[in-house]
Amino acid sequence: MGRGKVVLQRIENKISRQVTFAKRRNGLLKKAYELSILCDAEVALVLFSHAGRLYQFSSSSNMLKTLERYQRYIYASQDAAAPTSDEMQNNYQEYVNLKAHVEILQQSQRNLLGEDLAPLATNELEQLESQVVRTLKQIRSRKTQVLLDELCDLKRKEQMLQDANRVLKRKLDEIDVEAAPPQPPWNGNCSNGHGGGGGVFSSEPPQPEHFFQALGLHAVDVNQPPAPPPGGYPPEWMA
């Protein structure tokens, strides 16, 4: 099994603490020396024990030169990071202007909502009214444009549905034509019982006898001689 995580805390036993300090100090000084040799780095190490004893290491010949270089670097970084008085003044003025602009916008918003109208003068109320009227015009114009766009979209969908309906109707008509039974061919000639010459086919059905009776006519027998008229036969000179 692996070793558990070691919790770093102060060693309470004084002798053990001194022994551990000596070991870790020597290891730290050795690591600083190796780092300066292997990486050609300028290393300065300052260490004070619990009793106040100083231990130090410097890769250069003089520790003070390394410390002076460190101080110059730190102060230069602080001077570059710290803003000048002019920059601070400009930043503060910009902050004040932005804050005032935000307050004006908030007050204008409250006035448009009908709030805080008591302090406004007549001309300010007129300007506010004009602004509200312009805003309403813009809102109505935008609303009209949205409605027109929706109407155009609905018309486009309606046209698409009509086109699809026509296509379906045409397909249904084609299906009905294909499913209809074929009609037999019609011959215009009509043959009699003897197979003789043809005659003209009449599409009108024969009229029954009661049809002539309804018109005041009677069926006539061709083998019977015609009846004399009511006044008798006419004279021979009229025949």
Curated annotation (Swiss-Prot):
This is MADS-box transcription factor 34. Keywords: DNA-binding, Nucleus, Transcription, Transcription regulation. One of its GO terms (biological process) is positive regulation of transcription by RNA polymerase II. Its main location: nucleus. One of its GO terms (cellular component) is nucleus. GO terms for molecular function: DNA-binding transcription factor activity, RNA polymerase II-specific; protein dimerization activity; RNA polymerase II cis-regulatory region sequence-specific DNA binding. Highly expressed in leaves and at low levels in roots and spikelets (rice flower). The keyword Repeat does not apply. It comes from Oryza sativa subsp. japonica. It is found in: Nucleus. Pfam families: K-box, SRF-TF. Gene3D superfamilies: Transcription factor, MADS-box. Residues 179-208 are annotated as: Disordered. PROSITE patterns: K_BOX, MADS_BOX_1, MADS_BOX_2. Probable transcription factor. Residues 1-61 form the MADS-box domain. Residues 88-178 form the K-box domain. The lineage of its organism: Eukaryota, Viridiplantae, Streptophyta, Embryophyta, Tracheophyta. InterPro entries: MADS-box/MEF2_TF, MEF2-like_N, TF_Kbox, TF_MADSbox, TF_MADSbox_sf.
